[in-house]
């Protein structure tokens, strides 16, 4: 029964509001429900109809007479088939907005490209394993049991034959073969490397030395190999020193003077002794010899402490002393006649 409208009439193209029952029947605002779904009002009405139909079916079943177990089984099978059909209908539905017309639902997503190294042979992807397990669950259990990672040594497949006596015999045989083996490697003498037998080089005092320029070159510390020399090395070095001395002596050999040079040398020496005075070098040598003889005859006395004398720094070290003596020996070669003719 429509309500009486009081007021001006609606313009053409507009509809009047219906009753409350009509409003309930109108669809609710929002996205439309997908197919195979019904609104809550329709569900409630359907549930009422289903309950009434079930009640009527129950009354009919109570009125029917059970003729035997076969009739009960038939009714049970029919009920199971109806339940399966209902479950299939429920599974067809899905949640979410419906696809627009013209679009088809894809059953499976396209395979994604594999990023990374390929799996080794014999391995299956997790998706393939799950599909295989769905098809054959019994086979999946056997495969999983076989593919389990085994940690540790595998157990022996057969009986283990271990005997202490056989182990000792094998070990003795190996030692015998090692001792009696006449290979070329065993015949060669074992020579150790140089870093095992020689002293290392002098370590630099990194960060601990003086932070000034060097006033002179580094003094050689001498031969340090004497600490690690073997008898064979000492013999070899002795031979080398002898050969070096022979070669140096050959170089220092004077040339044989001729008869004329010898005669002229004797005349010059006799003239110098008779006509010339004694040289300063000879005078100095004579004084040193006489002084050394006097000091030898004097009794040794204890000398008192002298600060200036005893605490004086000796700047003339041993290396400089040796270098000066070596140079002084060469004076005779620098200021003497040549190795050829003594006289023109």
Swiss-Prot record:
The modification Phosphothreonine is found at residue 142. Residues 1-309 are annotated as: Disordered. A motif (GPALPP motif 4) lies at residues 116-121. The keyword Phosphoprotein applies. A motif (GPALPP motif 3) lies at residues 96-101. Residues 111-120 have a biased composition (Pro residues). Pfam families: DUF3752. It comes from the Eukaryota. Residues 58-67, 80-93 have a biased composition (Acidic residues). The keyword Ubl conjugation applies. A motif (GPALPP motif 2) lies at residues 30-35. A motif (GPALPP motif 1) lies at residues 7-12. This is GPALPP motifs-containing protein 1. It comes from Pongo abelii (Sumatran orangutan). The gene is GPALPP1.
């Amino acid at each position: 029964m429509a309500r009486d409208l009081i007021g001006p009439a609606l313009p053409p193209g507009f509809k009047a509001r219906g009753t409350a029952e009509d409003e309930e029947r109108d669809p609710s605002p929002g996205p439309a429900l997908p197919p195979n779904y019904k609104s809550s009002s329709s569900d409630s009405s359907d549930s009422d109809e289903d309950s009434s139909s079930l009640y009527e079916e129950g009354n009919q079943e109570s009125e029917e007479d059970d003729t035997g177990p076969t009739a009960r089984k038939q009714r049970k099978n029919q009920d199971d088939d109806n339940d399966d059909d209902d479950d299939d209908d429920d599974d067809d539905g899905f949640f979410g907005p419906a696809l627009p017309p013209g679009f088809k639902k894809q059953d499976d997503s396209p395979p994604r490209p594999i990023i990374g190294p390929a799996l080794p042979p014999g391995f299956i992807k997790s998706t393939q394993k799950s599909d295989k397990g769905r098809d054959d669950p019994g086979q999946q259990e056997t495969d999983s049991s076989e593919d389990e990672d085994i940690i540790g040594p595998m157990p022996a497949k057969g009986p283990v034959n271990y005997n202490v006596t056989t182990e000792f015999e094998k070990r003795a045989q190996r030692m015998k073969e090692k001792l009696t083996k006449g290979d070329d490697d065993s015949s060669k003498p074992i020579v150790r490397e140089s870093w095992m037998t020689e002293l290392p080089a002098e370590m630099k005092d990194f960060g601990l030395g003086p932070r000034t320029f060097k006033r002179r070159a580094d003094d050689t510390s001498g031969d340090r190999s004497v600490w690690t020399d073997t008898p064979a090395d000492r013999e070899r070095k002795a031979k080398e020193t002898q050969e070096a001395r022979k070669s140096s002596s050959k170089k220092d050999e004077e040339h044989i003077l001729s008869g004329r040079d010898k005669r002229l040398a004797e005349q010059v020496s006799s003239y110098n002794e008779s006509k010339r005075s004694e040289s300063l070098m000879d005078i100095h040598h004579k004084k040193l010899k006489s002084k050394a003889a006097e000091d030898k005859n004097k009794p040794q006395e204890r000398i008192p402490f002298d600060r200036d004398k005893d605490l004086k720094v000796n700047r003339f070290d041993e290396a400089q002393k040796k270098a000066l003596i070596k140079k002084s020996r060469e004076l005779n070669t620098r200021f003497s006649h040549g190795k050829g003719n003594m006289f023109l």
